[in-house]
Amino acid sequence: FTAELKPGDSIVFSASVNEVNPRGLKRKFTDCLKKMDKIETYRDRLVHNAHLHKCVSPDSTRINAGFSWLETGLLRETIVSLPGLTLYANGDCEEFEKILDTLIEDEQERLFRRTTQCEAPLRLTETLQQYIRFSGKEKQIWKKYGETLKGIIESYAPGRRKEVAMHPNGLLWTQMDNVALSWMNAYVYGHPVTERAGYQVETNAFWYNALCFAIDMENKYGAKKNNAFVERWTPVRDLVRQNFQPTFWREDWGYLVDYVNNGWQDQAVRPNQLFAVCLEYSPVDDEVISEVVMTINDELVTKRGLRSLSPRNEAYRGVYEGSQIDRDLAYHQGCAFPALLAPYIDICFKMMGDAFYKRAEYLTEGFFQDISKHGVGAFSELYDGDPPH
C-alpha cells in the first residue's frame, strides 16, 4: 500500500488474522507506547530483557530459560537467574518470592527425590544467601524457606537418591551409566561428552555451602536444644571440610581437579573449580583460593566469559561451528560462558577490592556492543573460546 503524509501526520499499521475496525487503533497504539519502558541506557536494555524472560500468568510467574528453544520453569536456570532478573533488575522481593514459590511447587521431584541436575537443588542455598544480602531479612527468609533447604539436604543422605550417594567421607559421589549429571550435559550419538562420574568439584562445593549455611541458620533460629538437624549434619559438614581439599587440590598443578573417580583425578582445567572458592562458605584454604583464581585468570578468562576448558587441553575446541554434532562437542569443551563471569568477578572483588574495578569494567564492557547486534537487547548464552569470540 502507499500513503501520502504531510508534516505532522502519522500512520499506524496493524496486522491481524481477522478484519478489525480501524477506529480506535491510534488510541490503542498510543496506550501501548505509554506502557512501554523507556530504554535510554544499557542497563535499561538489560532490565527490559530481564522482564521479557518472566512468563506471567494469573496465579504464577515462571522464568523462560532462553529464547528461542529452551523451556520455561527449568530448575537450574531459574535458581541461577532469579536474583538477577528480580532483585538486581527492579528490587522486587515480592516477585522474587512468587517465582521461587512456584518453582518449589513445580519441582518437588527434582528437589527432593531424583534429578540429572545433581548440583541444582543445592544451588537454592546461594539464591537464598543473595536474597538475604539484598533484603537483610535473614530470620524471615529462613523461617519461610528453611524447611525446604533442610529437606533438600536430607534428600542427599545415603540411600535416598539413585544418581548421587553421600560417601562415608562426607563427599557426594554422582554416577549413572551413560548419563551426564552436571550442567555440562551435551550428548553426541546418545553418549555424554563430559560424563564426569565420581566426586565433582562444584557439586561438593555447593554441598558444603548448603551444609554450612543451613547449620548456621538453625543454630540462630532453630530449636536451641536437641536440634536433630544440627546434631545429624554438623559431623557431615566437618567431614566435607576435612576431605574436600585433599581430594581435589593438586599443589603441583596449582588448581582443583575437575572430578575424581576411584582415586583418578581429572586434570582438565575447567571453571567448575570456581565455585569452591567463590561461595559464602569455602571448603579450601585462602592460599588455595589465590592459586585457583590465578589459574582461572591465566587459562579460562576471556572478554566474553569463562572458557569451559583450558586451551592447553588437547580436547579443547575453540570455535562453536559446524554440524550439530560439532557444536555439541565444542559446547563444554572450550566455549566461553558469560554467566560464569559473575562469580569470577565476585571473588576477585573480595580478594582485591576496588583495585579490581578497571579489570571488571574491561571484562564486561564488550557485552554492551553485542546488545545492539545479534540479540537486540540481549547477548548470547555462549561464545567461541578463541578470540575474537
Pin down the residues of each PLM region.
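An alpha-helix initiation/capping motif
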Residues: 118, 147-150, 227, 231-242
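Extended glycan-interaction surfaces of carbohydrate-active proteins
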Residues: 5, 11, 18-20, 26-73, ...
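Inter-helical turn/loop segments and adjacent helix faces that build the functional surface
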Residues: 131-144, 213-232, 287, 351-354
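Aromatic-rich carbohydrate-recognition surfaces in CAZymes
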Residues: 76-78, 82-181, 185, 200-204, ...
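Aromatic- and glycine-enriched pocket-lining scaffold segments that form the walls
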Residues: 155, 199-238
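Conserved small-residue packing positions in alpha-helical repeats and bundles
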Residues: 208, 215, 274-277, 345
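Beta-strand-rich interaction surfaces with strong enrichment in secreted/lumenal proteins
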Residues: 1-3
